[in-house]
Amino acid sequence: MKIHKVLGLMSGTSLDGLDLAYCHIWKKLDRWKFEIKETRAISYDIDMRARLKNSIDLPADELLIFHNTYGSWLGKQAREFIEEKELDVDIISSHGHTTHHQPQQGLTFQIGSGQQLANVSRHKTVCDFRSNDVALGGEGAPLVPIGDLLFFGEYDFCLNLGGIANVSYEYEGKRIAYDIGLANMILNHITQKIGLSYDENGKLARKGSINNDLLEGLNRLEYYKLPFPKSTGYEWFIEKVVPIIDATVDTTENLLHTSVHHICEQVALQIKTKSIKDQSTLFVTGGGALNQFMMELLQSKLAPTVSLVIPSKKLIEYKEALIFALMGILRMEQEINVLKTVTGASKDSSSGVVYLPS
């Protein structure tokens, strides 16, 4: 039995930082298994967070320079982690950081040069997992459902609450997935105005009350009316959501409380309309799963027919890095790692670009 030893790297839309997960992944009786052996979360400093946040507005030459700079930074973090923990690594599998995602224009771009990452880390690197799917007419997102299918297929629904909320589930023998809408991105935007990176356990949100005008404004967002397949990201958030939040005069607690209600309403609407069983399970990961107030509110909106399953903190925090590690293995094995039923592409694909260190 071959054990793949992979370092998965993930930087999400919430701009919290870089997640590193060193994983052993193997196949037993046609089922993929995993063990997360070592992890590290590197918080972005103020400068890096600002550069990533503003990268969407950079001129082309400056964006490409930052693409290389960030790739070198990723390589440095990976190499230091590998050396400090004395890890035996076959490949590094990196998502990069999405700066532009306009699949309707045939465009998706994740900064973090794979060649720079490979050179600095001194390890074979797989990255750029989205562009092939977009070239095949797909949304290039979400990508995590391949891991939901292969690792967590026993659950009826898999919900990830990162910067964006996305869900995947099995329907008529096919994996279906899409971005539901807002999650931590809106909450972090609100807390950063008072100098906090996030609302720990939803403590501030719990103290607030609903601002009905804000709730109605968020629920009216056109994205929620779009048909599947669909995906969204930071550009949509900046263009459509930030103006609504910034124009609302209210306390931080009320803004957070209302936003959490909005997130839970939209998630519950999607899950309840898709559930066909008397009792369904919803497997929840991503930073939102650590928000106790959000989890209590979501469970109340889904009861009694849907039960939340919340795994270990390690899996909550590193699931995406784990799944990108899996995607890198599948790419190296030339197996399917992006599903057309999820993205709307013309066919399934084995996506990702392989870089060798020089």
Task: List the model feature ranges, each with a label.
Residues 2-9, 103-108, 115, 119, ...:
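Phosphate-binding/catalytic loop of phosphoryl-transfer enzymes
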Residues 17-36, 41-42, 173-264, 334, ...:
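Conserved ATP-utilizing enzyme core subdomain
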Residues 99, 279-298:
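Glycine-rich phosphate-binding loops at beta-strand->alpha-helix junctions
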Residues 299-323:
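Conserved phosphate-binding/catalytic loops in two-lobed NTP-binding clefts
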Residues 59-114:
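Short beta-strand-loop/turn "lid" adjacent to the catalytic site in phosphate-handling enzymes
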Residues 73-81, 252-278, 331:
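Phosphate/ATP-binding catalytic cores across multiple sugar-kinase/actin-like superfamilies
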